[in-house]
Amino acid sequence: MKDITKTVADSFSGSSKLLFPKHMNNEGILYGGQHLMWLDELAGIVAKRHCGNEKQRVTTACIESVDFYKPCYQSDIIDMQGFITYVGNSSMEICIETYTGGFCDNKTLVNRAYLVLVALDDNGHPVTVPRLNPASIQEKERYEAGKQRSIIRKNERMFVLEQGDK
């Protein structure tokens, strides 16, 4: 699968949610955990689309960062947009941005998250994923930033594993 190349647009996915009381905490603000579940689901869809197979097994390996900029309230409609930013051998970094204000031209960014998912075979072992061909300047910048985050993650993982041996 590694010899296949995909674009960011090939796996772009979106999801909209109308927020109900069951999604709210006691302050009337969207539960962070509920939002995380939706982010993880959308990231899985993006990853499967990048692999080109809706049956492809993928798993969340890392939630790199989740930044909540503004709260979301009951009756808000949130729009989540997910896209690939970087791919390794078997891993895919996915950015998801969440907006409110979907009925007007001035959407407000309320959340940005980076998740890393890994493609797995039927035995749970990592498998190669298609390469990513970033087309626009913004996609190329995101790719390079994702590459740097991947290097940092690998170094941190090696450090933790080495510490466990002591």
Map each language-model feature to its residues.
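Short structured motifs
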Residues: 1-2, 62-68, 79-81
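Short, ordered coil/turn segments that flank beta-strands lining enzyme active or ligand-binding pockets
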Residues: 22, 26, 122-123
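Active-site helix/loop of acyl-thioester processing domains in fatty-acid/polyketide metabolism
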Residues: 34-54
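HotDog/MaoC-like acyl-thioester-processing domains
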Residues: 2-9, 13, 73-77, 85-166
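Small beta-barrel nucleic-acid-binding modules, principally OB-folds
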Residues: 54-74
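A conserved, well-ordered hydrophobic junction motif at loop->secondary-structure transitions
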Residues: 24-37
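Active-site-flanking beta-strand signature of metal-NTP-handling nucleotidyl enzymes
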Residues: 14-18
